[in-house]
Curated annotation (Swiss-Prot):
The lineage of its organism: Bacteria, Pseudomonadati, Pseudomonadota, Alphaproteobacteria, Hyphomicrobiales. The keyword Kinase does not apply. The keyword Transcription applies. Belongs to the GreA/GreB family. This is Transcription elongation factor GreA. SUPFAM superfamilies: FKBP-like, GreA transcript cleavage protein, N-terminal domain. InterPro entries: GreA/GreB_C_sf, TF_GreA/GreB_CS, Tscrpt_elong_fac_GreA, Tscrpt_elong_fac_GreA/B, Tscrpt_elong_fac_GreA/B_C, Tscrpt_elong_fac_GreA/B_fam, Tscrpt_elong_fac_GreA/B_N, Tscrpt_elong_fac_GreA/B_N_sf. GO terms for biological process: DNA-templated transcription elongation; regulation of DNA-templated transcription elongation. It comes from the Bacteria. The gene is greA. GO terms for molecular function: DNA binding; RNA polymerase binding. Necessary for efficient RNA polymerase transcription elongation past template-encoded arresting sites. The arresting sites in DNA have the property of trapping a certain fraction of elongating RNA polymerases that pass through, resulting in locked ternary complexes. Cleavage of the nascent transcript by cleavage factors such as GreA or GreB allows the resumption of elongation from the new 3'terminus. GreA releases sequences of 2 to 3 nucleotides. PANTHER family: TRANSCRIPTION ELONGATION FACTOR GREA.
Length: 157
């Protein structure tokens, strides 16, 4: 069983979604199936088929979440330190073309959300950042072309 890194916050979100799907969504879908079944002929019962499909999707996601929870290796970022970028680091960098400041935390694949400033450890930017430190410059090949960033801050929070 291959483990993957995850922050405590990301792990809690996974467990929260799993609980919701098991304790709220599953009973709601079962009730919808029972209600649709009460309408009679199942062969042409769109409500029944929609509820069964929702059940299948929900159970699939529950299985996926159970697997992720079992394989997660929780890394408490607040206990990390150092002057080199690694998993969990929050990095401040300046785009050398636009002088725009960007702040990203490097997290596990399952908890990445660029809009929230969390990038996957397997993303091109994170791969370029790993092992670097303040003052270093990285080059990232993105779909829109190559970008250069100067690392101006590094912390573990």
């Amino acid at each position: 069983m291959e483990k993957f890194p995850m922050t405590p916050g990301g792990f809690e979100k996974l467990k929260e979604e799993l609980r919701w799907r098991q304790q709220s969504e599953r009973p709601r879908i079962i009730e919808a199936i029972a209600e649709a079944r009460a309408h009679g002929d199942l062969s042409e019962n769109a409500e029944y088929h929609a509820a069964k499909e929702a059940q299948s999707l929900n159970e699939g996601r529950i299985n996926e979440l159970e697997d992720l929870v079992a394989r997660a290796e929780i890394i408490d970022v607040s206990k990390l330190s150092g002057d080199r970028i690694k998993f969990g680091a929050t990095v401040t960098m300046i785009d050398e073309d636009t002088d725009e400041e960007k702040v990203y935390q490097i997290v596990g694949d399952q908890e990445a959300d660029v809009k929230e400033g969390r990038i996957s450890i397997s993303s091109p930017i994170a791969r370029a950042l790993i092992g670097k430190g303040e003052g270093d410059t990285i080059e990232v090949n993105a779909p829109g072309g190559s970008r250069s960033y100067e690392i101006v801050g590094l912390k573990f929070v």
